[in-house]
Amino acid sequence: MSGIIEKKKQVVEEIAEKFRASQTAVVVDYRGLDVAEVTALRKELREAGIEFKVYKNTMTRRAVEAVELTDLNDTLTGPTAIAFSNDDVVAPARILNNFKKDHEALEIKGGVIEGQVATLDQIKDLADLPNYEGMVSMLLSVLQAPVRNFAYVTKAVAEQKEEQGA
């Protein structure tokens, strides 16, 4: 009997460690998806470096209490899977939200963003953000625009001076 309890404690500690280490964890209800759809979702998440796991709700509740994210307990009902991302904050929310558009059976319940419990609306807002590279390129284009405009103006002034001088 104690061997089973030890295994369960290890699973609880594994879940708790995943919550501690992850930038984002998104909790979903996968009820209504067939095996092929779940396999396709797992593949898409795996390609993005996201771990997608199904744990018993009771063990997940204990892990959530261990990492002091008890507000997440409300989402731990019914069939629950969790997508953990250690690197990209946006990717799990974006991939799951896009998958949900094609497969309405998938239900996003909530999650954790950088150690804080997030609501469904916050997860959806996060899904609408571009990834890191997209945000960097947007920032660079915003920073580059004034310099480019200044260059156009100075070129126009130089051309105007040339025309007046000639």
Swiss-Prot record:
Keywords from the named record: Ribonucleoprotein, Ribosomal protein, RNA-binding, rRNA-binding
GO-annotated cellular components: large ribosomal subunit
Recorded superkingdom: Bacteria
A GO molecular function held by the record: structural constituent of ribosome
PROSITE patterns noted in UniProt: RIBOSOMAL_L10
GO biological process, any: translation
Alphabetized InterPro entries for the sequence: Ribosomal_uL10, Ribosomal_uL10-like_sf, Ribosomal_uL10_bac, Ribosomal_uL10_bac_type, Ribosomal_uL10_CS_bac
Pfam family, one: Ribosomal_L10
Protein family per UniProt: Belongs to the universal ribosomal protein uL10 family.
Subunit record text: Part of the ribosomal stalk of the 50S ribosomal subunit. The N-terminus interacts with L11 and the large rRNA to form the base of the stalk. The C-terminus forms an elongated spine to which L12 dimers bind in a sequential fashion forming a multimeric L10(L12)X complex.
Purpose of the protein: Forms part of the ribosomal stalk, playing a central role in the interaction of the ribosome with GTP-bound translation factors.
NCBIfam families assigned to the protein according to its UniProt record, in alphabetical order: PRK00099.1-1
Protein's name in the database: Large ribosomal subunit protein uL10
Gene name of the record: rplJ
